[in-house]
């Protein structure tokens, strides 16, 4: 542990105990006797952690504090139980504040109706902030005299809020309510939503006339707004994408057609730095006002510019870009990633506490590339359907070990580059790896013409190269690669250390594509940085220094 690392806030004794517990596990897990009974100790730690976490929830000032996602948790409210199956099926995280929320209300019947009406919709969209949105919805519903009008407002906006701006959903809802009730004209509601109302499309020119004039930094597409002016602040969130693109560029991410926030898949994951990029690809859907260029499409175009062709799952190479090519073909998906289905339908399996590094499934997510050289055109043919059966048993074992080592090296390199070597508890070696494995792997790689090794690319300082980012995402990221609750990009820019946020976001985005795990980004008003790495089973607890006053901590759920 670095000397300058501070312990968690001493007044929070339970959290400090929890911190020490996992730090102790990190120190002793390689002892022989511990390794021998690792499974038992692992389960015992989970049990202790669950008890501690239950206590932590009770003492924290904010009610939605939950560190890790479990397959099980205790809820005293019987009426809540019927939602458990749906909650687990959608692999979301919800905080058990339902009892307090339900029983503290003067009208349990009305509260129950509110819960039943909104929880399925909130959970199905993005549940990480579902509880708080629900609590604030209740507050809005019962603090206003016009309950019917408020209820209509909540019903109208919650799906849009959850899908697009889940992290600030409550604030958006509150501000929309404020604007909604302070203006009699129904067009104000139309303006707030910024899209369509009763089938009437809002034109960007109309919105532009209503936007409060503020300072904008067009050079990087960043919008600098005064949060005190709620109307201008939330116009930034809800103005149409077309208007945004025309006036402010594209320094933000399109995620699954929702803009900032929501869910993303590999074929929907791309940043456009310039509007010309979008027009060039001609994949614009005017009905949705969103860009539908997928990362696989972008990858193929990018490689084509580099004079590289792809050979996909035994299919003939497609010399020209074919917009109708079905990249979502089930056979194609299974050939890339045998675990893609389990990753998307049961995210909890990849996000569960995994202290046992022996349970890595890296080999199931590995894809290898085989290259042939052409002396004339120097075209690399990447066979994404490389079959491990071409390797002998020894070769497969070495390949598996080296892939795990490479991924760990990649992770540590990225973290070190962001925060310095002394900021994280670095640990790259696995239980059975040795330096001799590297030489053995080189022999196997040369024998079977395996062309990739992430650790070698790191040595070449290619970690941030756009080529490798696309290739890594294509090779190692499951087709169902999912990111939920990405912190609002512009909100990150408003904090004191906006460059650090941006770099952190980019790096973890890259890491998550390599690790092929679901990763959730969420900001909460706390004072600690917590990371759970399912691949290696390491828990890293640390304070996140100098993050500014507005947002102090990033919690990553791996």
UniProtKB/Swiss-Prot annotation:
Keywords: Plastid. InterPro entries: DUF613 (IPR006851). Residues 338-354 have a biased composition (Low complexity). Its main location: plastid. Residues 355-380 have a biased composition (Acidic residues). GO terms for cellular component: plastid. It is found in: Plastid. It comes from the Eukaryota. Residues 338-380 are annotated as: Disordered. This is Uncharacterized 66.5 kDa protein in trnI-trnV intergenic region. It comes from Euglena longa (Euglenophycean alga). The lineage of its organism: Eukaryota, Discoba, Euglenozoa, Euglenida, Spirocuta.
